[in-house]
Every structure is written in C-alpha cells, then in structure tokens.
C-alpha cells in the first residue's frame, strides 16, 4: 500500500521474495477491496520497484487457489485459472500484473504456486490443525466437510528449500 516504502526497503537487494498477501479466503468475501489493495496493488508495488531498481530477480508467491477446481490432475501451469473467491481473483490479478512486467519490461521473475503448505505456526483454520485439535479434544469422529477433494501437502521447510533453489536457478 506504500510504493515508496516498498522501493526504499528493496534498495540494495539483488533478489526479492514477495510473500506478502492477505490469505484467509472466508474474509475475502467480506472485504474484497482489502484483498485487491494488498494482493494486486502490493504486487504492483513490488514489480514496479524491482523494474526501477533493476533487481536480478523477483520471486512472486501465488497460490494453488488460482486454479480453482481441478479440471485434470496433476495440475500444471497450463491449467486454466478459475477465480472461485475474491481471494483467488486477487491472486490471479497479482499474477497477471507480475506476468505483464515480465513480458513488457523483461523483468526477471518467477511465480511460485505452493500447494497447501503446513507446519509450525500454521493457522488453526487449516486442515491439519483442525484434525489435530479435534483429536486432542477427544472427538470420536473427525468432521472435515467434503472428503472428495484430493490434496497435496507441502511441509514449510520443503517450501523454503524450493524457494531457495528457485532463487539460485538460472532459469526463470
């Protein structure tokens, strides 16, 4: 929300990992404007500063939510993007802004779309903490909602390793 603050913070950097975002899907239905301001405009601030400062690379964190309901598995980068919430729409918008800077200005960037990262300090609303909480509360039958979707889970340390490898890679 503060392009000058972003630019100042990025001065002297070679690589920027753009991780900032509002991520709680349910809240996006109540305050979509906040998601647009943070996720889309925030990404614009990052890529604009990266272009102006001639950074070596920007790694933009997106989300698997941009794909919506899987049309096929495994999902790959060719899968259509389907906004199913204001959150996912804001992340698609952020991806499009980033892609436009890559195409228009040759800004070296990579968009990463982690799937269901889990680990320490994770939100209690996520699936794994939900299961653990129910078990610790001694419930006899765990309640999860729709059991049909299949999900991949990625431990947070593995996500970090992936980001580091992407930063070290010469490929965009």
Give the location of each predicted region:
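N-terminal Rossmann-like NAD(P)+-binding domain of SDR-like oxidoreductases, especially those catalyzing
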Residues: 1-117, 157, 167
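Short, hydrophobic secondary-structure boundary micro-motifs
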Residues: 37, 142-146
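Glycine-rich "substrate-gating" loop/helix at the edge of Rossmann-like oxidoreductase active sites
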Residues: 84, 115-125, 146-157
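Alpha-helical substrate-binding/gating segment
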Residues: 103, 129-141, 153-172
């Amino acid at each position: 929300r503060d392009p000058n603050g972003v630019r100042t913070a990025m001065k002297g950097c070679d690589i920027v990992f753009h991780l900032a975002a509002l991520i709680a899907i349910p809240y996006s239905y109540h305050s979509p404007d906040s998601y647009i301001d943070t996720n889309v405009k925030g990404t614009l601030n990052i890529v604009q500063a990266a272009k102006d400062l001639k950074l070596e690379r920007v790694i933009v964190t997106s989300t698997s939510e941009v794909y919506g309901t899987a049309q096929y598995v495994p999902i790959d980068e060719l899968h259509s993007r389907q906004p199913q919430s204001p959150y996912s729409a804001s992340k698609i918008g952020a991806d499009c802004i980033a892609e436009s800077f890559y195409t228009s200005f040759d800004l070296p960037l990579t968009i990463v779309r982690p799937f269901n990262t889990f680990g320490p300090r994770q939100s209690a609303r996520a699936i794994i903490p939900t299961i653990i909480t129910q078990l610790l509360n001694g419930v006899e039958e765990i309640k999860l909602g729709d059991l049909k979707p299949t999900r991949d889970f990625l431990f947070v340390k593995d996500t970090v390793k992936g980001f580091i490898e992407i930063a070290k890679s010469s490929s965009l």
